[in-house]
Amino acid sequence: MHMPPDPDLNSILTLPPGDQAGALWQLLDPPQWPIRFQDLPQGSALVGGAVRDGLLGRLAARPDLDLVVPVEAIGLAQTLARSHGARVVVLDRDRSIARLVLRGWTVDLARQEGATLAADLQRRDYSINAIALTLPQGRAGAVLVDPCQGLQDLAAGRLRAISEANLLDDPLRLLRGMRLVGDLALSIDRQSGGWIRDHRARLTQVAPERVLAELERMAASCSGHQGLALALNYGLLEPWLAGDAPPQSADLLLEALTPAQAQARGLSPDELLTALPVARLALLFDTASLVRLQASRRLQKRVGNLHHWLKRLQGPEIRGALERLAEDERLNLQIDLETDIPALLLHLERRQAETALERWRDPDDPLFHPAAPTDGHTLQKQLQVPAGPLLGQLLHYLKQERAMGRLPAQNHDQELIRTKAAGWLQARAREGGVINYLL
């Protein structure tokens, strides 16, 4: 989960305009960059998030560097990679965009679009993303280039689209705006908000995997609950929402899925990083949603299982619902959500969550980490149970007996296990479910 630094109230935006570029250049600390800025061609400029976040006083310790260069960027990236031992990833061959990956840094190089840097910036999505910092050349220092008045919008805490046409040039920009509003605590310019709402259906023209990547990035953001709630309210998510459409109060439910709420329930920072994104996605999407978004099978399963159990437990008002589940259903829940129990616990009251979390952290807890006390090979050998569905059912029965405390969790008494298994087989035989076994 991306946890940005708290904004600096004395940010660069409060400085006189003539001092801002120099202060930003100093803050960016180019000597720590993985490549020398002197190795870039004259006319190169830093753009994007590093400029924006630096101006806001939210710069990460190792920011992603996005550079516009007045030459073919792929060839330049390959040259720099050879001299710096970096890996090159071609992101867009037609537009000549490449990525350098080295020493934990990401440096994106893009060929300038248009005759000038200003023309390039005017093609972008939002004014706050259309600010560039030129690299020093000789005695000339760094200069801020802001043809779309992004500095004014940053200072005002406002998200403003450069133009309606720019948004439609890549409709994913509609959804990206929601993330920016949440991450940077911005308000949406009225006209821009109208464009986003009017053209929300255009988002279906974007490749599903790109939409999913933006949703995952939003869900993993510290303020992702706000971005998702906003996207929901603007109707951007309608084509992919779960078939059992989320409740009208989904935006309020998302507001409860915050890092502070997770910490209040005892989740560690690492647990929080894993639990919050899937909890947020599962509130809105089910397995079918993730299939339409071409998600991996693993993500389909995680989000789909959690969505199913949230619905089964009547949404976030779970409280005592877990205890009211029948044994077999409770076991199925624990099996389905074994790795994602912390995401479910975000919907519990604090004391319940803390108690359940303590049990989940114990890898030997028989309910929270259900496992059969023996294996199929042993049962086949001892009881002549053939491989197939019956053996699977028997193992599931023994798993349930152990999970519910009717078999020891630790000391696996093989004779007791054999007796339990034999009794189950005999009961099935009497019911006509299996042939009689010589036990």
List each language-model region with its residue ranges.
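Catalytic cores of the polymerase beta-like nucleotidyltransferase superfamily
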Residues: M1-L439
